């Protein structure tokens, strides 16, 4: 069997090393459990010592409140451990082995190959781990928390747990003991906790009742720091999608808090993306350190337990896999060659222009690697403000060319040409762009790509409309299946699996029209008609813009010799190679003067549609299009749509689309529409069904088991779905489906699939060798202590404090020092800054703040803005309102502008973003659709002029922000959470501290000083007014005559009176805007919207 579908076994050396590592990990866990002394006394001693230190530190607010004594007994006694019979739903031996090894291995990171049933294994493992534990002879339900789970993961885990619960209830005998028959304790409820679903009290009750909770990291951090749940109440934590966690993620913050207070609970992490653990320097050890993991379990496809289970089924299977190798058309082959050459030259030019940044890995051998673009971005983005504009364009061109390569094999000719034409239009001279063509358009092979893309649509005054070669092969396969069903009488449906929803919709239309008179050509004609209509609307908008503005005259780009040829100056009428020179000149003008569609726009498309089909067929097509739109509307009401095609020859089979439609498709479902389509529905036998679905919607083994297809057609290669088919065939040995595996031969599709298989195998090989040499990590309770960083801080503080050394050597002043406290808005826990503050020994107190994001002292308040948030806040003028609130309540309002660690420390990259159908594939110089760099700086300057006392801090990374906050807190008092919470709300206490009064007096003084900005007002006039009028508000209420009596100058009175009236109107408008806003603080783009009842109050 070809290596495209099945992967052979690995080397014997790797198999032996995997077995040795698994055995060693399990044995080390057993030895630790057997030899572990009773360290409860030691823990008490350490806690007593910590409490003494805390008493000496005079802690203002406990980070995690001390729980009653019964919490300390939450650790299960090893003497109470007893065997329990638990039924699992894992049919394959290697899956059961994964659960067994995960249970006996302490704090393990389990990395599996794609498509081996990870979610089923996780659900069964959760079912086992949530078994009630025996504490002091009494059963107690376990509390297991699931972190970093996607919404679809929660749905599938919940379904699997319900099935496991049903099996457990049906398997109980009547003779069981009274303890085991307690259904309430042995139930394992699964709940999903989000900010919008549960309030504080409901979450507190859930924590106490136990069970399995899938919770967002932001909510869990707040609950841990606020004392809603104590770490000792948590039996263990399970982290999904560990490969997606960033450095200093919230999950690592949670696990650090959990392990610092709970040393006996378990931590498990799962991933099925081994490639992410070999991309950087020692990423496996880094990830294990962040997640507090101690062991690694590797389960690749070539592991002997897995391969023996899956390959044995393949050898005995009667239904072999049929590989359908489809050849590319001549036009597609030429386009693929041209795109690869363009990529080659763009990569070479990027390396030539940036030799100090270029990597040897940037070559054509790795260009199809999924991490190729990520590798370029990781190097170029941090230096984005230093590289030239041509280099920026090359980076975007490489991304766009890869996108075109993918579109070549996944989309039809019309969509591909539309993408090419869109790129040409985007590189025409524009009002908002001062540069010329994108570099890839200046390559000689670009003309080859453009010409053949046009040729697939229009050639020699007629529409060619080249069909996708896979469509014809798919129709032939379905015909063969139809004939086979006449003899074997298989009852299962036919499943067609593809990559995305758009392909599903396109295949449904193609199969519907395959047996009609015009067939697939009619589908392409309708799509081309729609494309022409969109082009006409776009041109109208362009003309409106062009009529208002003019083009820049000097719009040129410095093109290197790689992308240009010098024009030869000669007097000869004929020049050798003139055709090539003309082609290059034509390409130069492709994006400026020549419209690639002008050649066939005069050709009447409506006549071509009617040609050979007649008016009746055209009306039928329009009726089908209307029916399709209605069907799409019904889709969101049901998970399946039924496409009626009475002319189909697939045994009168019906096409059924399973999966989610694109989000832009809206529904207008009503009773009349439903009643209209009720008569069109009829019963369809399973063997006549053709199900079209995406790989994403089939991303679990349960989907295939529910459908039970007799035939599976893989329209595109996908390594994960291939493994799912193998697992499904191993489960249903008697009813194995017949599989058709379609791919383009000698294409980037085939090469990408082979590269993905090789990349996964190489990643597992590196992980096996790295795990063999991985150093063991040991830690004590002192290492887990949160207060390990405070010693250096106290020494630094003691040097700054000017204490009297004659009074007990200055110890009294040192004794009064307390631990640093920072009050953080609960919505800021999506960022990594609160976790870094915690790691640096600062007490982080979550509160619902109306004013500011971080309160570091009673006088200093920070409003943190990432660059994207800053641009959005400047646009909607929200930042000005936030600064005004901080200025009202704090003496030192501060705007903190924070960049990410991997970003360029400049506003230039962010001012170059704009929407271009897909922001990741833009090939134009992007003048920001939000704000340009000059506009950002201008708005910031206006903000500073409006609020002179506003401080601005620029931080290149969250780590630098921590250092800045530590420096600002040196020698200053700690903030009060109760005061910080009520600022900006209606619950202002009458006995508010003197700080508010001082701020009010300072505000009055600053308002009076604005009078000096009025032309003609001298200092003498200013002091005369201050001597007679003490309050600025009282001055605003004076009439013109009263002000004139004070000044005795009518001209000056007019100016002052106008100034006061203007100030009063602005204040009234601002107060109106504040009343319209909600009492709680809203968030920016990356903040999570919360309700007030979902956030805890300040801990006391």
Swiss-Prot record:
Keyword Transcription (UniProt): no
Cytoplasm as UniProt keyword: no
Transmembrane residue ranges: none
Biased composition annotated in UniProt, kind: Acidic residues: 1065-1076
Residues carrying Phosphoserine: 613, 1071
Entry keyword set: DNA damage, DNA repair, DNA-binding, Endonuclease, Hydrolase, Nuclease, Nucleus, Phosphoprotein
Region (Disordered): 1-47, 1063-1100
Bias (Polar residues): 20-30
Biased segments, Basic and acidic residues type: 31-47, 1082-1100
Domain ERCC4, chain residue ranges per copy: 821-901
Gene Ontology BP terms: DNA amplification; double-strand break repair via homologous recombination; double-strand break repair via single-strand annealing, removal of nonhomologous ends; meiotic mismatch repair; mitotic recombination; nucleotide-excision repair; nucleotide-excision repair involved in interstrand cross-link repair; nucleotide-excision repair, DNA damage recognition
Subunit structure: Component of the nucleotide excision repair factor 1 (NEF1) complex consisting of RAD1, RAD10 and RAD14. Interacts with SAW1.
Family classification: Belongs to the XPF family.
Function in brief: Involved in nucleotide excision repair of DNA damaged with UV light, bulky adducts, or cross-linking agents. Along with RAD10 forms an endonuclease that specifically degrades single-stranded DNA.
Miscellaneous comment as given in the Swiss-Prot or TrEMBL entry: Present with 1400 molecules/cell in log phase SD medium.
Protein's name in the database: DNA repair protein RAD1
Organism expressing this protein natively: Saccharomyces cerevisiae (strain ATCC 204508 / S288c)
Protein's gene: RAD1
């Amino acid at each position: 069997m070809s290596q495209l579908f099945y992967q052979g076994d690995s080397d014997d050396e790797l198999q032996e090393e995997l077995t040795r590592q698994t055995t060693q990990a399990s044995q080390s866990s057993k030895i630790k459990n057997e030899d572990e002394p009773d360290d409860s006394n030691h823990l008490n001693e350490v806690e007593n010592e910590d409490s003494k230190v805390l008493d000496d530190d005079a802690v203002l607010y406990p980070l995690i409140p001390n729980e009653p004594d019964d919490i300390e007994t939450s650790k299960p006694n090893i003497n109470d451990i007893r065997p329990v019979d638990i039924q699992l739903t894992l049919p394959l031996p290697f899956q059961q082995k994964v659960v067994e090894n995960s249970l006996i291995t302490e704090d393990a990171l389990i990395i599996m190959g794609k498509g081996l049933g990870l979610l089923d294994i996780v659900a069964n493992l959760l079912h086992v781990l949530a078994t009630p534990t025996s504490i002091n002879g009494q059963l107690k339900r376990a509390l297991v928390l699931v972190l970093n789970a996607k919404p679809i993961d929660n749905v599938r885990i919940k379904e699997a747990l319900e099935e496991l619960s049903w099996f457990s209830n049906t398997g109980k005998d009547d003779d069981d003991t009274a303890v085991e028959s307690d259904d309430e304790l042995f139930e394992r409820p699964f709940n999903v906790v989000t900010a919008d679903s549960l309030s504080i009290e409901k979450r507190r009750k859930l924590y106490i009742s136990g069970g399995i909770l899938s919770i967002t990291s932001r909510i869990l951090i707040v609950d841990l720091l606020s004392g809603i749940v104590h770490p000792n109440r948590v039996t263990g934590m399970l982290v999904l999608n560990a490969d997606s966690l960033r450095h200093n993620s919230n999950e690592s913050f949670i696990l650090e808090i959990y392990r610092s207070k709970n040393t006996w609970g378990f931590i498990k992490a799962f991933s099925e993306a081994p490639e992410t653990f070999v991309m950087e320097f020692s990423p496996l050890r880094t990830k294990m350190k962040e997640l507090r993991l101690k062991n690694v379990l590797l389960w690749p496809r070539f592991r002997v337990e897995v391969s023996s289970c899956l390959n044995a089924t393949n050898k005995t299977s009667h239904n072999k896999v049929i590989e359908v190798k489809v050849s590319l058309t001549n036009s597609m082959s030429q386009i693929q060659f041209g795109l690869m050459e363009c990529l080659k030259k763009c990569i070479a030019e990027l390396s030539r222009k940036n030799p100090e940044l270029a990597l040897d890995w940037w070559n054509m051998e790795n260009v199809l690697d999924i991490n190729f673009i990520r590798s370029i971005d990781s190097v170029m983005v941090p230096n984005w403000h230093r590289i030239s504009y041509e280099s920026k364009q090359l980076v975007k061109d490489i991304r766009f060319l890869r996108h075109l390569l993918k579109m070549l094999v996944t989309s039809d000719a019309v969509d591909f040409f539309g993408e090419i034409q869109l790129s040409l239009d985007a590189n025409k001279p524009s009002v908002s762009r001062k540069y010329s063509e994108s570099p890839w358009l200046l390559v000689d092979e670009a003309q080859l790509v453009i010409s053949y893309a046009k040729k697939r649509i229009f050639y020699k005054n007629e529409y060619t409309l080249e069909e996708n070669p896979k469509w014809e092969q798919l129709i032939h396969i379905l015909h063969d299946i139809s004939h086979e069903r006449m003899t074997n009488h298989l009852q299962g449906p036919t499943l067609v699996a593809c990559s995305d929803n758009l392909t599903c919709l396109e295949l449904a239309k193609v199969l519907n029209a395959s047996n009609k008179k015009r067939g697939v050509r009619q589908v392409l004609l309708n799509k081309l008609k729609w494309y022409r209509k969109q082009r006409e609307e776009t041109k109208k908008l362009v003309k409106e813009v062009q009529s208002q503005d003019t083009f820049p005259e000097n719009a040129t780009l410095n093109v290197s010799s790689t992308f240009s040829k010098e024009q030869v100056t000669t007097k000869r009428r004929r020049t050798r190679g003139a055709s090539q020179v003309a082609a290059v000149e034509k390409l130069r003008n492709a994006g400026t003067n020549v419209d690639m569609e002008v050649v066939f726009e005069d050709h009447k498309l409506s006549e071509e549609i009617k040609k050979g089909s007649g008016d009746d067929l055209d009306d039928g097509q329009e009726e089908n299009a209307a029916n399709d739109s209605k069907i799409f509307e019904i889709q969101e009401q049901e998970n399946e749509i039924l496409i009626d095609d009475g002319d189909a020859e697939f045994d009168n089979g019906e096409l059924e689309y399973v999966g989610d439609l694109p989000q832009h498709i809206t529904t207008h479902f009503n009773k009349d529409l439903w009643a209209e389509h009720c008569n069109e529905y009829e019963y369809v036998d399973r063997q006549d069904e053709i199900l079209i679905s995406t790989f994403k919607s089939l991303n679990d083994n349960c989907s295939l088991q529910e459908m039970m297809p007799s035939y599976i057609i893989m329209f595109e290669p996908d390594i994960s779905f291939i493994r799912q088919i193998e697992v499904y065939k191993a489960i249903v040995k008697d009813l194995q489906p017949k599989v058709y595996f379609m791919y383009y031969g000698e294409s980037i599709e085939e090469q990408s699939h082979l590269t993905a298989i090789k990349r996964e195998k190489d990643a597992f090989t590196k992980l096996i060798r790295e795990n063999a040499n991985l150093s063991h990590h040991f830690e004590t309770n002192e290492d887990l202590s949160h207060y390990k960083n405070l010693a250096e801080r106290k020494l630094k503080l003691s040097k700054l404090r000017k204490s009297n050394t004659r009074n007990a050597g200055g110890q009294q002043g040192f004794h009064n020092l307390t631990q640093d406290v920072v009050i953080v808005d609960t919505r800021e826990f999506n960022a990594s800054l609160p976790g870094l503050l915690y790691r640096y020994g600062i007490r982080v107190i979550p509160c619902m703040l109306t004013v500011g994001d971080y309160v570091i002292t009673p006088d200093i308040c920070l409003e943190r803005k990432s660059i994207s948030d800053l641009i959005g806040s400047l646009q909607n003028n929200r930042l000005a309102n936030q600064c005004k609130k901080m200025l009202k309540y704090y003496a030192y309002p501060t705007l903190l502008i924070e960049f990410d660690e991997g970003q360029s420390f400049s506003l230039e990259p962010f001012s170059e973003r704009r929407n271009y159908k897909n922001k990741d594939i833009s090939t134009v110089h992007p003048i920001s659709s939000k704000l340009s760099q000059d506009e950002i700086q201008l708005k910031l300057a206006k903000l500073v002029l409006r609020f002179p006392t506003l401080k601005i801090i620029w931080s290149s990374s969250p780590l630098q922000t921590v250092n800045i906050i530590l420096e600002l807190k040196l020698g200053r008092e700690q903030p009060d959470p109760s005061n910080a919470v009520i600022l900006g709300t209606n619950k202002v206490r009458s006995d508010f501290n003197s700080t508010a009064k001082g701020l009010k007096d300072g505000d009055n003084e600053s308002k009076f000083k604005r009078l000096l900005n009025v032309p003609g007002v001298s200092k003498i006039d200013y002091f005369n007014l201050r001597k007679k009028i003490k309050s600025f508000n009282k001055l605003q209420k004076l009439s013109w005559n009263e002000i004139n009596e004070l000044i005795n100058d009518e001209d000056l009175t007019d100016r002052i009176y106008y100034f006061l009236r203007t100030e009063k109107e602005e204040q009234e408008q601002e107060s109106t805007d504040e009343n319209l806003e909600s009492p709680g603080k809203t968030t920016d783009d990356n903040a999570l919207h919360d309700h007030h009842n979902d956030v805890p109050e300040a801990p006391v």
